[in-house]
Amino acid sequence: MTAQSSSTQARHGMTTDNEVLLEVKGLCVDYVTESGNIRACDNVNFLLRRGEILGVAGESACGKSTLLNALGRLQRMPAATSAGQILFHDRNGSVTDLATLSEADLKPYRWTKIAVVMQSAMACLNPILKLSEQFIDVQRAHDPSLAEKDALTK
């Protein structure tokens, strides 16, 4: 599995923002089985800065989805995060370890400050609708009071 990030700002000639957004340290995810644990992600470390896009690529069953599910705290049994930190650096300067939050404490972060976009046939963009319509629809699903103009700039 490979994870690479690139700055969209740098590619478009804008000044890059060196602010750290997400820092993953020593993340391990195991699948718990009757015959013992199977390590799917072993000591994953990376840093993602604001304005960067992270792509995760690899062979089938190498742990890509397991890693992304762990980052969003979306994994289900038998998968379990066994070690590591998922540090979210908020714009206000606070740093929160998402791996240690309860579901209730995680709620203000999930889908508003951090989200995972999975590749899936059912999650593809609709070729019949304009892109802007699809983005507005997603934004309004999370914030029904959001004006169309604000949804497009977000």
Residue positions per predicted region:
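ABC transporter nucleotide-binding domains
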Residues: 2-154
